[in-house]
Amino acid sequence: MTSLKLLKEKAPLVICITNDVVKNFTANGLVALGASPAMSEFPADLEDLLKYAGGLLINIGTLTDENWKLYQAALKIAEKYNVPAVLDPVACGAGEYRKKVADDLINNYKLAAIRGNAGEIASLVGIDVASKGVDSAGVDNIDEIALAANEKFNIPIVVTGEVDAIAVNGEVVTIHNGSAMMPKVIGTGCLLGAVVASFIGLEKGQELKSLETAMLVYNIAGEMAEKRPNGHLPGTFKVEFINALYEITDEDVKKFKRVK
């Protein structure tokens, strides 16, 4: 099984093209975990960096026409160097323009995984689910949404919510770990996309196990952070979550994981 120890040993360079709100939080989270983030947004620089990268994150949160072109350029370069790319289609269910961009990136470029909340992923496959931009209401059929997207796009899918679902090659697992504090801190979902990009390329052909490990590490770190003094307060939780990502071990994952 793909392990946190393996990630720390490889310390993959992860290129994060993400939204302006979360860049600092994302970079610090990846460093704490053991990956090496680069927040580059210049195509010529990306050509140099992606030669050595272990993963690429495309997060469409701060969407502009210029950024759309940047996403396309980055994905072309990533495919050239066989770098696994993860798409976070932020708020793609909130409007036609975002949906158009997400559809373009999914249909015309090579992706290793898509990570989104239930509302975002449901919108990609035409399932009607209540969604509020980057947030999504509690959804009972999250595993069905993940499977529908996996079957439609033939791409590994991670759907997040009160329960998380991972679908790869028609197989679905659900993750029942996590903290209720996560949605109260802006950027936790976006950082998760970067964590997925850190794990997805560690072991070829082991995408399901890699994604499962990524989700467990992330969610159990959230549980650890919430249990610490004042972890029920969002400001403290944010700091303690970074600390927990730094301290969590494979033994913690084995002890506390809840997978179905």
Curated annotation (Swiss-Prot):
Biological classification of the source: Bacteria, Bacillati, Bacillota, Bacilli, Lactobacillales
GO biological process: thiamine biosynthetic process; thiamine diphosphate biosynthetic process
Purpose of the protein: Catalyzes the phosphorylation of the hydroxyl group of 4-methyl-5-beta-hydroxyethylthiazole (THZ).
Keywords: ATP-binding, Kinase, Magnesium, Metal-binding, Nucleotide-binding, Thiamine biosynthesis, Transferase
Stored InterPro entries: Hyethyz_kinase, Ribokinase-like
Coiled coil ranges: none
Transmembrane intervals: none
HAMAP family (UniProt xref): Thz_kinase
Gene of this entry: thiM1
Pathway it works in: Cofactor biosynthesis; thiamine diphosphate biosynthesis; 4-methyl-5-(2-phosphoethyl)-thiazole from 5-(2-hydroxyethyl)-4-methylthiazole: step 1/1
The keyword Transport is assigned to this record: no
EC number of the protein: 2.7.1.50
Any one GO molecular-function label of the UniProt entry: magnesium ion binding
Necessary cofactors: Mg(2+)
Residues that bind ATP: R115, T160
Enzyme class: transferase
Species for this entry: Streptococcus pneumoniae (strain P1031)
Binding residue positions for substrate: M39, G187
Stated family: Belongs to the Thz kinase family.
Designated name of the protein: Hydroxyethylthiazole kinase 1
Any matching Pfam family: HK
